Amino acid sequence: MRIVYEKYGLQDQCPYDDFIACYMPNNESLWTRHHHREITKEYLKRERFRRSFEQCGIVCNDPLQFDYDYLETIVTLKQVVDGAPELLAHLTKRGPVHVLSNGFANLQSRKLKSGGIDKYITKLILSDDIDVTKPDRRLFDYALEQVGGTPETTVMIGDNYDADILGANNAGWHTIFFNRKNVVLETNVADLTVTRLTDIIAWL
């Protein structure tokens, strides 16, 4: 995001690190509301930057255009989470790997390709396909129908405890929580919790 932030010259109004400190909780909160169908994706895209700019005293005439430029920049970056290629290479030896996402439909396949990991993915299933979002069980059941899977033989690896882990658990799937942010949970229904993706290799 720094690339777009500096392209707009916003660092002159607010240091980038201060802006990110505002943006991250706003973005996470809005995504949680979207997961539970409380807001639309359009509202999320418009509001996450508008709200953050306002809190930081930043004047940006078109937050929605900023969001568009940010998303278009993301798909050009050849970045993946540490350990992702190694884990995916291991998983494909065990069976087909699919992606189940609440993300923006016009970006997901491009992100996989730019990161060089699309070759590991058999099928990309999006919430937009049936207008239902994780953690709603209907999306998980739909995903199994699409790939011919069963709950007993399917494992969800996800970094969002609410949308990924609770949703998959409710659908009867096995679950692995990638706790990349070291979130402290009062209860944890995941079969395995890791902070590094490569730790999953020894378990599967």
Task: Enumerate the predicted regions with their spans.
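N-terminal helical cap/lid subdomain that shapes the substrate entry/recognition surface
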Residues: 1-81
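Arginine residue identity/basic-tract feature
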Residues: 2, 33, 37, 46-51, ...
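Short, well-ordered coil loops that connect the C-terminus of an alpha-helix to the N-terminus
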Residues: 10, 58, 93, 149-150
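A short alpha-helix capping/helix-coil boundary motif
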Residues: 26-30, 64-68, 86-88, 119-121, ...
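Catalytic-core regions built around general acid/base machinery
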Residues: 83-94
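Asp-based, Mg2+/Mn2+-dependent phosphohydrolase catalytic module
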Residues: 89, 100-204
